[in-house]
Amino acid sequence: MFLHSQDFATIVRSTPLISIDLIVENEFGEILLGKRINRPAQGYWFVPGGRVLKDEKLQTAFERLTEIELGIRLPLSVGKFYGIWQHFYEDNSMGGDFSTHYIVIAFLLKLQPNILKLPKSQHNAYCWLSRAKLINDDDVHYNCRAYFNNKTNDAIGLDNKDIICLMRQ
């Protein structure tokens, strides 16, 4: 269910949003990043993903988001659970008047780049970066770098050894 902008603004101002991030890895271990057009994280490199809609099952959200963000509809079984994360932004999709708080369910997808049909609706450019490069690149948003940096405390329900284990897989 998509909401009118005023209703959505009230929700973003008042409560966390639930989203799915798609950590897409190619055969060389590089991660797909898109340069964000929209707020929050506008102008930063970030993994694809998006919100879970009201009354939408996670499986359906995953399929919808892979189609919208990667250009190919994929079942949830393609993704490997990569933890639950918390993302905080000082702005929101409508402007800078209030912050945005996401609870993010992340999935790792190992895909061949040639099957992707990357759209330009959310990102104006794409690149593949190694984990080592993206961790040290300030143009990659902090919340995205956190997926590969075991020193952050942004994973919920995972301790550092679990994050390290996920990063090596």
Swiss-Prot record:
Domain (Nudix hydrolase): residue spans on this chain: 13-152
Cofactor annotation: Mg(2+)
Keyword Aminoacyl-tRNA synthetase belongs to the record: no
UniProt cofactor note: Binds 1 Mg(2+) ion per subunit.
Catalytic activity line of the entry: GDP-alpha-D-mannose + H2O = D-mannose + GDP + H(+)
UniProt GO molecular function: GDP-mannose mannosyl hydrolase activity; metal ion binding
Keyword Metal-binding: yes
Subunit relationships: Homodimer.
Protein role: It could participate in the regulation of cell wall biosynthesis by influencing the concentration of GDP-mannose or GDP-glucose in the cell. May be involved in the degradation of GDP-mannose and GDP-glucose, diverting the GDP to the synthesis of GDP-fucose as required.
Name of the protein: GDP-mannose mannosyl hydrolase WbdQ/WbhG
Species per Swiss-Prot/TrEMBL record: Escherichia coli O157:H7
